[in-house]
Regions:
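Short hydrophobic/aromatic beta-strand immediately N-terminal to the Walker A/P-loop
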Residues: 26-28
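Conserved glycine(s) of the Walker
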Residues: 36
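Proteolytic processing junctions in secreted/extracellular precursors
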Residues: 2-17
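Conserved GTP-binding G-domain of TRAFAC-class P-loop NTPases and closely related GTPase folds
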Residues: 144-248
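Phosphate-binding P-loop
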Residues: 17-24, 101-103
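Conserved substrate/cofactor phosphate-moiety recognition/catalytic segment
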Residues: 39-105, 119
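The conserved Walker
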Residues: 32-33
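Conserved phosphate-donor/acceptor-positioning beta-strand/loop module used by diverse small-molecule
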Residues: 112, 116, 129-150
Length: 248
């Protein structure tokens, strides 16, 4: 266990989160294959410093380094399939570790999901709210026809029946997602048209949520504690309530 002086000298105790503008915000992205979730996120949240939690990114990087062409998964040998599965597991572990570090610092998050597993989303979002996060859902919607067309155009496509089944499953979860996050924290983006930029109303709605003032007593208390640690480390006065605030 750290003694008090070690505690003040430990650089890991004060996380980077206190210096980030958009701490305690978590944006969930939901939508099926070909919906354009990544494009919507890039157009609305780029430059915000939010940490992207998406195991697909790591998986694709691992596969590329290993020389696996994910467009040819249907033709993989047994050994290639085994390697692909191991790389997927490694990417998920890495994403979980990165996500945990981000949450430890209460950093803002962009969490990529499909919405098929609503139970998992609800559990994770509830956990984040327990820590003081403000959680939002951005539902990126398309018709099934557009989803199928875009899937064919993607570098890594999936079989058409999977796209259709996924689209139907996600549509069936919409009402539950609205209840889960609350109508005021749910933004639906109709993304059927090809365009170079995001609809201005959508952009404004998402940025408004991003800049919403923190109100959670848990979040405000965490910020107060982190500032107290910084002051203590800098040699500032430690008042009588310091230990109670930090160690309660």
């Amino acid at each position: 266990m750290l003694n008090f002086n070690d505690f003040l000298d430990n650089e890991d105790i004060v996380t980077e989160g206190i210096h980030d503008k958009y701490i305690f915000r978590a944006f969930y992205l939901a939508g099926g294959p070909g919906s354009g979730k990544s494009w919507v996120a890039a157009k609305t949240l780029e430059g915000s410093g939010l940490k992207v939690v998406n195991s697909d990114i790591g998986f694709e990087n691992y596969a590329k380094k290993a020389g696996l062409d994910l467009n040819q998964m249907g033709d993989f040998t047994k050994d290639e399939t085994k390697l692909k599965d191991e790389l997927r597991r490694r990417a998920k572990r890495g994403t979980e570790t990165m996500g945990q570090h981000a949450v430890n610092g209460r950093l803002g998050l962009i969490i990529d999901s499909t919405a098929r597993d609503a139970d998992k989303i609800e559990s994770a979002a509830s956990g984040l709210r327990y820590l003081g996060y403000q959680t939002y859902m951005i539902f990126v919607n398309t018709t099934v026809e557009v989803a199928l067309q875009r899937n064919e155009e993607r570098p890594r496509s999936v079989p058409a029946p999977i796209v259709m089944r996924s689209h139907a499953q996600i549509q069936n979860q919409k009402s539950r997602l609205i209840r889960m996050f609350g109508a005021s924290n749910y933004i639906e983006v109709q993304n059927n048209k090809r365009q170079d930029d995001i609809n201005s109303d959508v952009y404004k709605a998402i940025r408004k949520k991003l800049n919403t003032k923190l109100t959670s007593p848990i979040a405000l208390k965490w910020i107060e504690n982190e500032k107290a640690i910084i002051r203590a480390r800098a040699g500032g006065k430690i008042d009588k309530g310091f230990f109670a605030r930090i160690f309660r």
